[in-house]
Amino acid sequence: VHGTPLGDNRYDYDYLNEYIDFYNVMSYDANLDDVTSHLCPLYKNEIDSRNYSIDEAYHKLIKKIPNEKIILSAAFYGKAYQIDEDIENDLVIGKKAHYIQSEYQSGTCHYFYIKSHYNKEKGFEVFFDSKTKSTYAYNYKTKVFVTYDDPISLKAKIEYIKNKKVGLMFWDYGGDNDSELISVIIDNTKGEEYDKERKI
């Protein structure tokens, strides 16, 4: 199911809960294509016109789905934007922008591609938004903004899902060709007892 409220009235959760063991929640890729926003934010940012977050999705779904059936998600890919307006006070969220040709035409790029193409050597600085718990890269010269999950934002998500006692999935495995992100998941859930409630 999608993490945003869009199309929510199409689901009869009372009926589905009788037959579905768990729900993979697509809590990523709700970006607007004409305004910069984080790909997979854990918490909301008031300047993000999309006004969406994983935490928001969880609190929406917990009213309709048993907690032990909820599996939230992380992204092993990112989105690249060209910002089309001036930047003031380093605020890059909520700016007029468009997806650029990246690894794919829609601005989509795997995590391994981000590491090799949107790094310090290519003029990018990497930032962590402490409010939304989101990582992004930005090039002040070209005004290219890239939003994605990295080990820091992924650890924040893992702590969240452990606290809520829900599960974690990701999309997709092919984006992590050196297993950096997979290792973060393993290292930060190691020793956790596997059971139906936690799904770790």
Question: Model-predicted segments: where are they?
Answer:
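Active-site rim elements
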Residues: 47-48, 142-149, 169-172
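Generic structural signal for well-ordered alpha-helices
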Residues: 13, 54-59, 158, 179-186
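A short, acidic, flexible beta-alpha connecting loop/helix-capping segment that sits on the rim
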Residues: 172-179
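Conserved active-site loop/cleft motifs that coordinate metal ions or position small ligands
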Residues: 71-73, 167-172
